[in-house]
């Protein structure tokens, strides 16, 4: 018997095993350092190295709405397993495990509140729920949120995070792509803003539908936004893709994303945008270029021009004579006689 087993109760509490919560330390994917979880929660799960970790709807709602005050929308129920799908596991079993993991019925959650004192409906896709895949439940959630935005004359904001359409629902999941597009069209007809926050990752059918038809596209730093994966593209075209391909910064340089905003600055940026689009706040004034600046610019351009400029005067239209080659008349071919000449008797 070890002497540690004969310790008094007080010392046993000191030297005994303690239950430690899981994921107390989280490894930064960018630097490899371990970061204390409480520190991550205070920084909205942005590591000191700047990596934006994936977060769920609860944290999104609390950080985006004014004063963390919002009301979650009740989303309609859909048929759970319309195709009775089964691969290595039953689809219903996958749904049960994802619900137990996230505490939600599906990957999409919606809430209404104020951002920058402006009415807004916010949709959040949870990548922890079956990869945020788009299915019937997510499609109904999107349409419900769009209808709420139309009813309350609010902006619709969505934070996308998805691997694409949910294969376990087949064509029923693909049908959600045009359905969500129609809902967005109704928002635009009502002159209500539709803003997309592209988070990591936004791929597949989601990137091919409602994720890329917003009025304004905001990307989180280094978020992957693509239809197909980089490895698939490289194997198809047999070429090496450029560095940073399909990342938010790469898309920003090429005009597919309007801005890249740190998650901690996102509420203020959204409030600024909504106040301009919905609050009647005038756009920031742009100072006109002074005449002196224009003259300096013209002088700089003149210095950069070649020393000698040869001007060629174009001929008048009347003076242009189009010479046509002389037409040569082809000799007609002799026609063959259709009847043979008659024989003559000598």
UniProtKB/Swiss-Prot annotation:
SUPFAM superfamilies: ClpP/crotonase. It catalyses: N(6)-carboxybiotinyl-L-lysyl-[protein] + acetyl-CoA = N(6)-biotinyl-L-lysyl-[protein] + malonyl-CoA. It comes from Hirschia baltica (strain ATCC 49814 / DSM 5838 / IFAM 1418). One of its GO terms (cellular component) is acetate CoA-transferase complex. Pathway: Lipid metabolism; malonyl-CoA biosynthesis; malonyl-CoA from acetyl-CoA: step 1/1. Residues 300-311 have a biased composition (Acidic residues). One of its GO terms (molecular function) is ATP binding. The gene is accD. This is Acetyl-coenzyme A carboxylase carboxyl transferase subunit beta. Its EC number is 2.1.3.15. Keywords: ATP-binding, Cytoplasm, Fatty acid biosynthesis, Fatty acid metabolism, Lipid biosynthesis, Lipid metabolism, Nucleotide-binding, Transferase. HAMAP family: AcetylCoA_CT_beta. Belongs to the AccD/PCCB family.
């Amino acid at each position: 018997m070890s002497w540690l087993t004969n310790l008094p109760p007080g010392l046993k509490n000191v030297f005994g095993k303690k239950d430690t919560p899981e994921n107390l330390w989280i490894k930064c994917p960018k630097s490899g350092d371990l970061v204390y979880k409480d520190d991550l929660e205070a920084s909205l799960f942005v590591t000191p190295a700047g990596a934006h970790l994936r977060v769920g709807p609860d944290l999104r709602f609390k950080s985006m709405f004014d004063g963390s005050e919002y009301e979650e929308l009740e989303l309609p129920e859909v048929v759970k397993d319309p195709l009775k799908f089964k691969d290595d596991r039953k689809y219903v079993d996958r749904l049960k495990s994802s619900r137990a993991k996230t505490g939600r019925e599906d990957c999409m959650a919606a809430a209404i509140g104020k951002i920058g004192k402006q009415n807004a409906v916010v949709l959040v896709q949870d990548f922890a729920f079956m990869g945020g895949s788009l299915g019937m439940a997510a499609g109904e959630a999107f349409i419900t949120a769009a209808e709420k935005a139309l009813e309350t004359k609010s902006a619709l904001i969505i934070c996308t995070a998805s691997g694409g359409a949910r294969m376990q629902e087949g064509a029923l999941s693909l049908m959600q792509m045009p359905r969500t597009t129609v809902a967005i069209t109704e928002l635009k007809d009502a002159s209500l803003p539709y803003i997309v926050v592209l988070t990591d990752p936004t791929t597949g059918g989601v990137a091919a539908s409602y994720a890329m038809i917003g009025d304004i596209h905001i990307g989180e730093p280094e978020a992957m936004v693509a239809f197909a994966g980089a490895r698939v593209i490289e194997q198809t075209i047999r070429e090496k893709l450029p560095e940073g391909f399909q990342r938010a910064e790469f898309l920003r340089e090429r005009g597919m994303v309007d801005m890249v905003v740190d998650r901690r600055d996102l509420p203020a940026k959204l409030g600024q945008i909504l106040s301009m689009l919905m609050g009647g706040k005038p756009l920031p004034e742009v100072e006109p270029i002074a005449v002196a600046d224009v003259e300096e610019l013209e002088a700089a351009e003149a210095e950069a021009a070649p020393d000698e400029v040869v001007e060629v005067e174009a001929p008048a239209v009347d003076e242009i004579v189009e010479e046509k080659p002389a037409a040569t008349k082809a000799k007609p071919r002799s026609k063959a006689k259709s009847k043979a000449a008659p024989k003559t008797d000598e």
